[in-house]
Amino acid sequence: IRPFIASREAFLKGALLIENNAEYALRENFIFSSNLKYSIADNFDDLTIPPEDTYPAQVRSDIKEYLRDFGDGIIIGRAQLDYYFTPKKNHHLRFSGGILEEMFNGVGFEYLYYKEGSNYAIGFEVFDVQKRDYEMRFGSLDYKNVTSHLNLHFRNYGRLPFDTKISFGEYLAGDEGITIDLSRTFSNGTKFGVFASFTDVSSEQFGEGSFDKGIYFNIPIFGNYINYSWRPLTKDPGAKLIRKNNLHDLLVKFRPIN
């Protein structure tokens, strides 16, 4: 089920989807992952009211254009090739390329310094991305940008009742700032979190809502995850790539929670 909540056309819109998520180990350290969707039924056709603000660049506020094409056949949500590499103990790299999410293609890499068993980690990521066309197959729009972030992680439930991630950098729309993410992972693997981003886009320029913020949850099921996030408003400032996962989450996935 793909919900779209609190649009100006109606409080709740949605789609009933058949969805396939797959991962293939092509060879050692090379993983190809895909996400395909097909809409059995949806009511996105009348999402016609344009966004009030598209500042500083339209990277997320045109979400309705993508949703309206959900009923036009198979949608490619992701088709991504990853190469994982550990050049030195505690130093981890991942190179990625392809269709990274529903709205962006691109190539990039992620680095993480993480010592096994440590409560701290630090890393950075850089991605050269291009906006996908609204049919969500292989075409692209004109918009391009390089987005990059320095990421700091802290996880110690003996001191804080939540995981903390702080990111500094440039977002998809070209604005710069900081994102604070607080989450809690439970012993069964379920994760709930909240986030907020504060960038060089002022609250007046941002408009209603003042800054980007939201909640999310990840629920493990049958060896995979149900992922969902919600923002009260879908705007462009503070927008980041919707990543399949990150190196830190992969490395601590099976670590006992202390």
State the predicted function of each range.
Residues 1-81, 85, 138-145:
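Outer-membrane beta-barrel initiation region
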Residues 6-14, 28, 40-45, 71-77, ...:
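Solvent-exposed loop/turn segments connecting transmembrane beta-strands
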Residues 16-26, 52-57, 78-87, 106-126, ...:
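Feature captures outer-membrane beta-barrel proteins of Gram-negative bacteria and organelles
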Residues 1-7, 32-34, 64-67, 89-100, ...:
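Transmembrane beta-strand segments that form the barrel wall of outer-membrane beta-barrel proteins
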